[in-house]
A protein has these predicted regions:
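Alpha-helical transmembrane-bundle signature of multi-pass membrane transport and export proteins
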Residues: 1-246
Length: 246
């Protein structure tokens, strides 16, 4: 049975990986609370399935565009600082949702705009998170580190919405947003204790041409293009955003 156990070696060996993993887990809990809170609030405001579904649609284009550019930035900038800044931006966006939820007449348009901004920051953050791993763990621990990052996501996607549902149904949407803000504060503090992860000396400055080259390369590789299309289809057709509040 030991061979089926989770390899925790990267967490034991690398303090910086442990900080990144813990920060990501905690902030993802909060993000999943907001993932529940946003459609619930839209349902309360409109009572419409379509209005709830639109909150998911507005995330697709920013996620794709900024996900591509996030890869360029992750190659050219300090990855720790990039992750830290995107966490801070996510905190600010959640604060906007919190303030909006406490208004007498919350703005539906503002919720849609912030949902798109969340997707953009997520697109910027994920490539930096992935690119940071080889600089934080030994080569022989890369597989275990990738598995732990996947485990972090699985825990968050299961536990986070459950916590969000309890908080929102017991208290309010505002409490859910406040809980998310608290998780981002913790995450930002943990990331601040990580070492810097500067780009290599050969890294080029981020540019539109680098982004275009990356897109051309992705389209030239059928294996990569297939994984992108599968991920996009799963996000577009399998995420139950419109069903959560009903």
């Amino acid at each position: 049975m030991a061979r089926y156990a989770i390899d925790l070696a990267p967490l034991r060996k690398s303090k910086d990986f442990s900080l990144l993993w813990a920060a990501g887990l905690i902030s993802y809990f909060g993000s999943m609370i907001t993932y529940v809170a946003v459609p619930f609030q839209i349902k309360e405001l409109t009572g419409s399935y379509v209005a709830v579904a639109i909150s998911g649609l507005v995330e697709i284009l920013p996620l794709i565009i900024f996900g591509l550019y996030g890869g360029v930035l992750a190659d050219a900038l300090d990855r720790k600082k990039l992750i830290w800044v995107t966490e801070l931006l996510s905190l600010l966006f959640t604060a906007i949702l919190l303030i909006n939820s406490m208004m007498d007449s919350p703005s539906l348009l503002l919720i849609y705009i912030v949902s798109g901004l969340f997707a953009a920051t997520s697109g910027l953050r994920q490539p930096a998170m992935q690119a940071a791993l080889p600089r934080l763990v030994d080569h022989e621990d890369m597989t275990a580190a990738a598995a732990l990052m996947s485990l972090r996501w699985q825990i968050g996607v299961i536990v986070g919405p459950a916590i969000g549902g309890i908080l929102i149904s017991t208290y309010s949407v505002a409490v859910g947003y406040a809980a998310d803000i608290a998780t981002f504060v913790i995450s930002i503090v943990l990331i601040a204790f990580m070492k810097n992860i500067p780009p290599s000396h050969e890294a080029e400055a981020p540019s539109l041409s680098a982004l275009i080259d990356g897109v051309k390369y992705a389209f030239s590789r059928k294996d990569l293009l297939g994984t992108y299309l599968i991920d996009l289809a799963a996000m577009f057709f399998a995420m139950p955003t419109a069903l959560i509040p009903f």
